[in-house]
Every structure is written in structure tokens, then in C-alpha cells.
UniProtKB/Swiss-Prot annotation:
Catalytic activity of the protein: beta-D-fructose 1,6-bisphosphate + H2O = beta-D-fructose 6-phosphate + phosphate
Protein name: Fructose-1,6-bisphosphatase class 3
Cofactor(s) this protein requires: Mn(2+)
GO biological process: gluconeogenesis
Major enzyme class: hydrolase
Pathway annotation: Carbohydrate biosynthesis; gluconeogenesis
Keyword flag Disulfide bond: no
Gene Ontology molecular function: fructose 1,6-bisphosphate 1-phosphatase activity
Family: Belongs to the FBPase class 3 family.
The enzyme's E.C. designation: 3.1.3.11
Transmembrane spans: none
Superkingdom of origin organism: Bacteria
Name of encoding gene: fbp
Keywords: Carbohydrate metabolism, Hydrolase, Manganese
Length: 664
């Protein structure tokens, strides 16, 4: 039975008010019919290519390169188009130009002896690549992607045949005129950016843009201007959202992590957070303290620091860590329902003897200098610490760039996403030992599974946006911190975060953080099916896509789990994890032919990519191959278009039976 035969006079009358509104956009039978034809045509195009990335952790150079080369897709297309008609070095040069047009043009112009001839050859090559990557889209969609100043010319070049002699001459005249009017550079840049844009139709970031890397703010700048993307918040993203909401414990954690890895760029250069008060306080308070255990991990730092600066960062690191423990204890005292009393650890120190007393056992402390801690009241901030935190608070709350990036995270982000039979979330859905969903108490009500993630999503938004209910906002702000380190938080899901123990106790038995049952049970297909069903994801080819836990490829661990139902794609974008993973990240690519996992080798640098044509070496694995090419009609977008077509067909009937008059 067709959609047309489902349309009855009763259904049209029931939808009449909506159809009258729709008639404003399509005021005639001809207009509605044309739109139906257009939408039906779109349904039968191949689905756009989706790219999934996770756990970028501030590694902006590698992230931007993967976007520019579309995880190796641009290089593959250049090889397909030009085959043996170009030498390998020429194909490499063309790819580098597509990735970094402005920078590569400068190098070319400094060395090329006949620049006009180079322009002529290169523009023809770019037109061929552009024709290839745009072939799966409607002309309308391509047109919307074009820069306004070159829109008409690019359309002419893309849609004219070069086989007919007359058309070939026509195209050559256009290209020659671009060169003679000295617009070749701008045109090449526009074409390269268009190729990048059309090669990735949609981008999914499955959490953790932020953390230890040097340029989370640069990644956010890129995303805020990106044509089509979404974000599933990771634990580090939530921590920054908590800081931007005004939670001072989250602010302290953010600063501590930056100090630990010697990456101050995001805080200072990106968001203008004034760290001078912290530096002054740390120098005064820890002037005679070597702070040895707080020395930053400089092999991951964003700059090379001299000895004096390293000493200062070390002191600042210790100062903010102690403040963090105090601020967190205040939340724990305020919220006994969080059940985290066992994480108040300063009170377990015997300050006179320099030992940590835990469960009847004594452990020597690696650092025994606590000038700001009163043993009688260990969690009270000193007057100087209180003043410092107020200044840090002011700095976070008045950063315009941070506000812009947080709005972007809220607008395009969420705790999870269901898209084209895939369920995306960063870390976990808390489970009991038997695989049932763990019930989590929030404000006296129990939540689990999908409802739990929905409730948490709402609380995070309340923490940032709510101006009306002060008590609700205060709870939500505290709960954001719980999401960072609370045992029942889907974004954390461990028994504890052993920050204190890792700093102060040498005995590694106290460093252990036990993961929730999800991480053991997620390898079972029936568990993944249960989670997918909970989120309403049904069908033959359904998947859960996760990040959060690095896949130790170097030890033989596989990203595919539970018979292919679960894909864990944290492969180590973060340089800190690359020794563990043995690679430098994954991209999951979902196109009309199926699912592919692209495994990346470490990226050297943008400079080497531009000057030497160094690309990321990537290995592609086919996870799922579609025997029949997947079309737009098979996607979520296709379902929306089918609904729109049905509404337009109702409008046509309403016009034809006179319920709505045409506006000719």
C-alpha cells in the first residue's frame, strides 16, 4: 500500500491547520509537486559519509589533519582519479595542497618558475577531485556548500562535461580567466576547502575534546565553524562545563590537570584565565618547598620551559591540588547523598608523623609539607586560598571565548545520540553484576538506563543555564562534579578516583580504581542488545560506539567487541596514551558501502605535513560491508524526508479537493 493510498479526507481535516501553515512555503500545486520530486530524488542518493572520532584530548594538530584528509579518504580519491597518470610525488603534492591550501601555496610560489602553468594544471586537477567528491550530493546541497564569491563559477566547472570539445574549451576559458585576473590563489583555497567539506558529510565527536593536550580551544574553534557535527559529552568535557557553570572544584581540577601535563595554552591563551594570582600564591606559600612529586610531565607539554618556569608550574600544581581536595570535601559534606564520605582523605593524615592512616594501615607520605592545612580543620580554606579561588572564579565566569565554546557544546552536544542505527555515548551505562541496569538515586528518585542519561543531560543544562531556581541550580552544579568522579556516574563508573593516592602514596595497591560492571559485561552480545533495545535502537545492523577507555592495540586488544555490536574507538589521539595503545587513534567511517575502521599512526606535525608532504599513515579495516549500497532512504534523515513527502502529498490532495486554495 502506498503512502498516497493512506491519505484520507479525515486525515487531511485532522492536519488542516498544519497543512495551512505548510501552504505558505508551497503555495501552489506546482510548488508542492516540485518539492515532492526533489525529496524523492534525494531519497535515492547514496547516504553521506559519517566520521566518528573520540578522545581527542586537546591534540588539535592531529585532529585537524584527520579532518583535512578525511581519515585518508582524500588520498584514496586522488589515487582513484589519477592512478598512474600522475607520479606519486605529484599526488602527494596535490593532497598536501588540498589539506593546507594557504600554506602550500606560499611554498609553491617561492619555488615554482612558471606559476601560471602550475595554476592551469592544478585547477584542472582540483576540478576533477571536486567533481568526484560532489557526485553523491544534489546540486542544491553542493551549492549551499559553496563560497558566495565563487559559487556560480564552481557550479559551471563541476557540472559541465569536459568530453565535448565545445564544453572543454569553455572550461579552459574559465580557468584561464581565473588565472589572468589573479584570482587563482583564492579560487584554489575555495576549491580545497570545498573538497574537505564534501568528503565528510557529518562528524560525530564521541567525547573528550578537553584534557591534557595543548589546544582544546583550537579544536572547539574548528567545531564551532564546522558544517555538520554533534558531540557526546565525555568526562573531561563535563568537567570543563562544570567549571564554566561556576563549580570551583571543577575549576581546580581543570587547572590541576593543565599543570600536571605542562599545558597552559588552553587556559591562558585560549580562554584568558588569569593564572597570575595562583602563581603569586604558590611562590609565597611553597618558596622553600621542592614540590618534587608535582613536577609536570614535560614530555607532553605544549612548550619547552626553562628551569625557573618549571619550578613555578610545579609550585602552582601543588597549590591548586591542595585547594582541590578542600573544595571537593566541602561538596561531599554538603551532599551526603553522594555517598562519597570515604574520599575525604586529608583527615586521615597524621601530620606529625607524616603518614596516611587508611583502614587501620599506615602508609608513609611522599610529601609532608602542608603549610595551608590545619590538622584540626583540614578542609578549611585559608584567607589567601579563599581570595585566590574568588579570583579564579571571576576569571572563568567572565571568559567570553569560554562562554562561546560552552554554548557550542550545549547546542550540539548531549549525553548520548541515536543516529542511523548506532548508539553513541562516551563511557558507560551503569550495570549491576547480573547485567541489569543499575538504579541510581538522584534527589530521592531512581533512574536507570536511558532515563538516567536523560536526567543527567537535564541536570548539566540546569547547572549552566538555570537562573530561576537557586537550590536546583546549586544541586546541579554539585552533581556535575559528581559526574567527574562519582561511582555511579556514567561518565566515570569506577569505585573511586585515586587522585590523592597517586600523588602522595607510593604503594600502588592504593592507586587501583575498579571499573564498574559495564566494562566487563560489554563484551557480551546479549548485554549490548539489551542496551540498544533500552535506547530504542533495533534492527539487524545496530552498534554501540564508545570511547573513554584506550584500546591497547599493542597488546592485541581489538576495538570490536561483542561480536561486532560494540565498537570502542579510543585509539590514543592523546600522546600520553600512545605508549599504551601503540597507535595514534581511530576513525570510524560509515558510508554507503558499510562501516570501516581507520587506524592512524602518530602525526608528526603540521609543519612537516606542509613542507615535506607527510601524511598520517592509516590502515583501513572493513567491519561491515553492505551488499546493496545504502541510500538516504535507509537513514534517519530519509525517514524525516518520507514524512515530509507524505505531508506534501496531503497538501496536494487538500488543494485538489478545495480544502485549501492555491495562492497563485
Amino acid at each position: 500500500m502506498t503512502a498516497q493510498s493512506n491519505i484520507t479526507p479525515e486525515s487531511i481535516v485532522a492536519d488542516l491547520r498544519y497543512l495551512q501553515l505548510l501552504s505558505r512555503s508551497f503555495p501552489t500545486i506546482a510548488a508542492a509537486s516540485t518539492e515532492i520530486i526533489n525529496l524523492e530524488a534525494i531519497l535515492n542518493l547514496p547516504k553521506g559519509t559519517e566520521h566518528f572520532l573520540t578522545d581527542i584530548h586537546g591534540e588539535y594538530e592531529a585532529f585537524q589533519h584527520v579532518l583535512k584528509n578525511a581519515s585518508g579518504a582524500v588520498k584514496r580519491k586522488v589515487n582513484e582519479i589519477f592512478g598512474h597518470t600522475l607520479r606519486e610525488i605529484e599526488k602527494k603534492e596535490l593532497c598536501t595542497l588540498i589539506y593546507y591550501p594557504e600554506e602550500k601555496l606560499q611554498l609553491i610560489k617561492a619555488t615554482e618558475t612558471d606559476i601560471d602553468d602550475w595554476y592551469l594544471i592544478t585547477l584542472n586537477q582540483l576540478v576533477k577531485v571536486c567533481q568526484n567528491v560532489s557526485s553523491k550530493y544534489t546540486r542544491s546541497k553542493v551549492r549551499k556548500s559553496l563560497p558566495a564569491e565563487f559559487s556560480y563559477i564552481i557550479q559551471e566547472l563541476l557540472h559541465e562535461s569536459t568530453i565535448e570539445p565545445n564544453k572543454h574549451a569553455y572550461i579552459n576559458v574559465i580557468i584561464s580567466t581565473i588565472i589572468s585576473t589573479r584570482r587563482a590563489d583564492d579560487f584554489i583555497i575555495a576549491m580545497c576547502n570545498l573538497i574537505q567539506r564534501l568528503t565528510i558529510d557529518s562528524l560525530h565527536i564521541v567525547g573528550d575534546i578537553y584534557d591534557r593536550g595543548p589546544g582544546a580551544h583550537i579544536i572547539m574553534d574548528t567545531l564551532c565553524d564546522y558544517h555538520n557535527f554533534d558531540i557526546q559529552w565525555g568526562n573531561h568535557d563535563i568537567l570543563w562545563m562544570g567549571a564554566a557553570s561556576g563549580n570551583e572544584a571543577c575549576m581546580a581540577n581543570v587547572i590541576r590537570l593543565s599543570m600536571r601535563y605542562g599545558n597552559l595554552g588552553t587556559l591562558e591563551d585560549g580562554y584568558g584565565i588569569n593564572l597570575l594570582p595562583l602563581a603569586t600564591f604558590a611562590m609565597d606559600t611553597y618558596a622553600d618547598d621542592p614540590c618534587t612529586i608535582f613536577a609536570p610531565k614535560t614530555n607532553f607539554a605544549d612548550s619547552t620551559y626553562n628551569e625557573k618556569t618549571l619550578r613555578l608550574i610545579t609550585q602552582m600544581h601543588k597549590a591548586i591540588t591542595i585547594i582541590q581536595f578542600k573544595l571537593e570535601a566541602n561538596i561531599i559534606n554538603r551532599r551526603p547523598e553522594f555517598g562519597m564520605g570515604g574520599r575525604k582523605l586529608l583527615e586521615k593524615i597524621d601530620f606529625e608523623r607524616g603518614v596516611f592512616v587508611y583502614e587501620g594501615k599506615e602508609y608513609p607520605l611522599r610529601d609532608t609539607n602542608f603549610p595551608t592545612v590545619d590538622p584540626a580543620d583540614p578542609y578549611r580554606l585559608t584567607d589567601e586560598e579563599q581570595e585566590l579561588i574568588e579570583k579564579i572564579h571571576y576569571s572563568f565566569m567572565n571568559s567570553e571565548k569560554l562562554k562561546k565554546h560552552m554554548r557550542c557544546l550545549f547546542t550540539y552536544g548531549g549525553m548520548y545520540l541515536v543516529c542511523n542505527s548506532n548508539l553513541l555515548y562516551h563511557a558507560s551505562v551503569p550495570l549491576n553484576e547480573d547485567g541489569s541496569f543499575k538504579h541510581v538515586n538522584i534527589c530521592g528518585k531512581e533512574y536507570w538506563g536511558k532515563n538516567l542519561l536523560d536526567k543527567i543531560d537535564q541536570l548539566i543544562r540546569t547547572a549552566y543555564f538555570d537562573e530561576d531556581d537557586e537550590e536546583e541550580k546549586r544541586f546541579a552544579m554539585d552533581y556535575i562534579w559528581y559526574l567527574w568522579c562519582g561511582p555511579d556516574a556514567p561518565s566515570f563508573d569506577k569505585d573511586k578516583m585515586a587522585t590523592f593516592e597517586r600523588y602522595f602514596i607510593a604503594d600502588k595497591s592504593l592507586h587501583k580504581e575498579t571499573k564498574g560492571y559495564y566494562y566487563a559485561l560489554r563484551n557480551k552480545e546479549e548485554i549490548c542488545d539489551r542496551i540498544l533495545e533500552e535506547f530504542g535502537v533495533t534492527g539487524q545492523h545496530t552498534h554501540i560506539i564508545n570511547g573513554h577507555v584506550p584500546v591497547k592495540t599493542i597488546k592485541g586488544e581489538q576495538p570490536m567487541k561483542a561480536g561486532g555490536k560494540l565498537l570502542v574507538i579510543d585509539g590514543g589521539f592523546s600522546k600520553a596514551y600512545q605508549p599504551e595503545t601503540g597507535i595514534a587513534g581511530y576513525t570510524l567511517v560509515y558510508h554507503s558501502h558499510g562501516l570501516q575502521l581507520v587506524q592512524h599512526d602518530p602525526f608528526q606535525s603540521t609543519q612537516k605535513a606542509i613542507e615535506e608532504g607527510q601524511d598520517i599513515k592509516s590502515t583501513t579495516f572493513v567491519i561491515e560491508f553492505n551488499s546493496q549500497r545504502m541510500m538516504v532512504k535507509d537513514t534517519d534523515k530519509g525517514k524525516e524526508l518520507v514524512t515530509q513527502i507524505l505531508d506534501l502529498k496531503k497538501l496536494l490532495v487538500a488543494y485538489r479537493i478545495g480544502l485549501i486554495k492555491e495562492k497563485v
